[in-house]
Amino acid sequence: MKRERGRRGRKRVCSFCVDKATSIDYKETSKLRKYVTERGKILPRRISGNCAHHQRMLTTAIKRSRNIALLPFSTEA
């Protein structure tokens, strides 16, 4: 059997590196919502296109924002 080759898309660029962001503020919910799915899950690096450093900062910012109820943990289904 022939093995199908996966299609690779264009490599995404880290939006925080482009803006030269030194920190990610947990109070900016509009920016954080772009990196959370409709179900409330944090988007992985391969989909969001962030570098490892900013992905870690983004994850902690989203978790902080959830803890003080600026972002929901999940949707009501």
UniProtKB/Swiss-Prot annotation:
Annotated Pfam families: Ribosomal_S18
One of the record's GO molecular function terms: structural constituent of ribosome
Keywords attached to this entry: Ribonucleoprotein, Ribosomal protein, RNA-binding, rRNA-binding
CC annotations in GO: cytosolic small ribosomal subunit
InterPro entries in the record: Ribosomal_bS18, Ribosomal_bS18_CS, Ribosomal_bS18_sf
Alphabetical GO biological process terms: translation
Family classification: Belongs to the bacterial ribosomal protein bS18 family.
Cited NCBIfam families: S18
Description of how the protein assembles with itself and partners: Part of the 30S ribosomal subunit. Forms a tight heterodimer with protein bS6.
UniProt function note: Binds as a heterodimer with protein bS6 to the central domain of the 16S rRNA, where it helps stabilize the platform of the 30S subunit.
Protein name: Small ribosomal subunit protein bS18
